[in-house]
């Protein structure tokens, strides 16, 4: 039987109930083939991460059975990896090739033993030592162990890991995830379980990871909100919907097409969700020139959106973003802007102008200056040189993602309601509980304490807080991290119909292709490019501008030869 037809594990009647008596997995029967590439999608709280933990053997409090064929190994990347804080980056990454490191250590011990007088004086011990040395040499040759340092360096470079001598204790959450992912990929397990693998990765690292997983011989099961990733890697989509696991053959675009047709058959009246799916499918089917035209049309439609009936817009959209005050001609302008910290120059001679109704996607590696740009806009930082001006009519809506001012003891409902059942939004009364439900906080979830929220729940709350501010310029810092695809789709539509500007830091190229009218690209070495067009338009522009000269790290190289 060919490997791609061999079932390596099955889930037999798997169910899971969490307090207070909420069933998130309901009687799931699934079989998984060796080599299959599976993307898991569903609302936050639908059981995606729980499913991975059950497969990984970390969650045993479920009903039913998970049956593995003998001899297969499982590797798991969790959302918040637990790493030894006392180890360095290199020491943790080396754990991914522990069998090879153990062989090298023993080989060194054997070589050192040749100097032992007891061995030198005993021909029998010398023969035994030479035989073991030859055995180890064969194993090391077979695994190309002599090039292990190059392999580790290649892997760490591909995923932009921090310097190899840095202690884990001083790393950010994003840096820890990259180190953990690097270690896992080097282990090369037969079954690779990935929980939001693209979070905290820049576009180049995501591209490398996609190519690596496309060629990965084993089974890959990934929970992700990144729809381009699902399109490029997945051969199957597993949708978790109200506890049921529904498999769909094909990538994300194929799922979108099949799902829309199925919903059309099941529903006589068009729901908001179905209409949202249909509009995304319409966008997917657009030719590139039609997408460009749509982006340009947004820039000239500010007055139309501003004067549109907000009640009708709210009824049409799953996430409705109310218009803020009318913007003047000057929104945000930078001329010859420069900013550095000590010897590190973030940008030099930065120039851009954000027009009314523009949506700027901000891209670039971590530490390049994206957060500093937000701080400049907020007036929390000053430039070293140049002119930076925020227009007088600008009202900024932004919530610090660190949530420093939020008490962990407060509930989601208390944070949004501020002690009142309804508040004014878009010129109308909005019920606080109804507003939260738009961000998939329903029922008991609204009473969850801030201190126990997951990453995805925190980001949804962050969005709800920011959009409630009724600003005319939205600053969204990584709004797509850990958020389910349904909420992302609704957010995209909300932004498309918003009469105002947005500055969105994101590594999600699908989101930027749908919403961005401009790209502000932090390209490294203090170079920043402001480009009118979507993310894909910018990528094409960059290829034409740079020709075949690409940074060495962009080119895909395998971890193993």
Model-assigned labels for residue ranges:
Residues 1-271, 315, 322-561:
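ABC ATP-binding cassette signature C-motif
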Residues 138, 287-290, 297, 318-324:
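Alpha-helical segments in transporter systems
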Residues 258-291, 295-301, 305-312:
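Intracellular alpha-helical coupling/juxtamembrane segments of multi-pass membrane proteins
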């Amino acid at each position: 039987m060919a490997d791609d037809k061999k079932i390596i594990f099955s889930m037999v009647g798997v169910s899971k109930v969490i307090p207070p008596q909420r069933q998130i997995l309901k009687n799931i029967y699934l079989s998984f083939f060796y080599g299959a590439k599976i993307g898991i999608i569903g609302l936050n709280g639908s059981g995606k991460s729980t499913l991975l933990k059950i497969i990984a053997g970390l969650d045993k409090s479920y009903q039913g059975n998970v049956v593995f064929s003998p001899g297969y190994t499982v590797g798991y990347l969790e959302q918040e990896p637990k790493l030894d804080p006392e180890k360095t980056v290199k020491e943790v990454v080396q754990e991914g090739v522990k069998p090879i490191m153990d062989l090298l250590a023993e080989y060194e011990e054997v070589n050192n033993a040749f100097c032992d007088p007891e061995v030198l004086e005993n021909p029998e011990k010398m023969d035994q030592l030479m035989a073991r040395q030859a055995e180890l040499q064969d194993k090391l040759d077979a695994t190309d162990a002599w090039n292990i340092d190059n392999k580790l360096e290649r892997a760490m470079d591909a995923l932009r890991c921090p310097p190899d001598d840095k202690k884990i204790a001083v790393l950010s959450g994003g840096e820890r995830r990259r180190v953990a992912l690097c270690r896992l990929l080097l282990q090369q397990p037969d079954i690779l379980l990935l929980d939001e693998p693209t979070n905290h990765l820049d576009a180049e690292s995501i591209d490398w990871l996609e190519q690596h997983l496309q060629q990965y011989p084993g089974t890959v099961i990934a929970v992700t909100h990144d729809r381009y990733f699902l399109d490029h890697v997945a051969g199957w989509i597993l949708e978790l919907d109200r506890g049921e696991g529904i498999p769909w053959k094909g990538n994300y675009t194929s799922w979108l097409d099949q799902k829309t047709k199925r919903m059309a058959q099941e529903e006589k009246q068009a729901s908001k969700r179905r209409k949202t799916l249909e509009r995304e499918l319409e966008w997917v089917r657009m030719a590139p020139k039609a997408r460009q035209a749509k982006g340009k049309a947004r820039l000239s439609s500010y007055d139309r959106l501003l004067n549109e009936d907000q009640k009708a817009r709210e009824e049409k959209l799953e996430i409705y973003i109310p218009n803020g005050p009318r913007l003047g001609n000057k929104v945000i302008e930078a001329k010859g802007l420069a900013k550095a910290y000590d010897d590190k120059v973030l940008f030099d001679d930065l120039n851009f102008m954000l027009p009314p109704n523009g949506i700027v996607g901000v891209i670039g590696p971590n530490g390049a200056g994206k957060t500093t740009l937000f701080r400049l806009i907020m007036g929390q930082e000053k430039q070293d040189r140049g002119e930076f001006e925020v227009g007088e009519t600008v009202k900024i809506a932004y919530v610090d993602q660190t949530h420093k001012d939020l008490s962990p003891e407060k509930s989601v409902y208390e944070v949004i309601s501020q002690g009142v059942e309804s508040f004014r939004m878009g010129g109308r009364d909005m019920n606080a509980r109804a507003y939260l439900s738009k961000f998939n906080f329903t029922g008991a979830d609204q009473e969850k304490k801030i201190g126990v929220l997951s990453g995805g729940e925190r980001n949804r709350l962050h969005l709800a807080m920011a959009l409630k501010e009724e600003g005319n310029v939205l600053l969204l810092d990584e709004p797509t991290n850990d958020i389910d695809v349904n909420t992302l789709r609704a957010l995209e539509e909300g932004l498309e119909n918003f009469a105002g500007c947005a500055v969105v830091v994101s590594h999600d190229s699908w989101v930027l292709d749908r919403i961005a009218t401009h790209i502000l690209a932090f390209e490294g070495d203090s170079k920043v490019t402001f480009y009118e067009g979507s993310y894909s338009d910018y990528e094409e522009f960059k290829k034409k501008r740079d020709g075949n000269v690409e940074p060495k790290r962009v080119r895909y190289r395998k971890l193993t030869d």
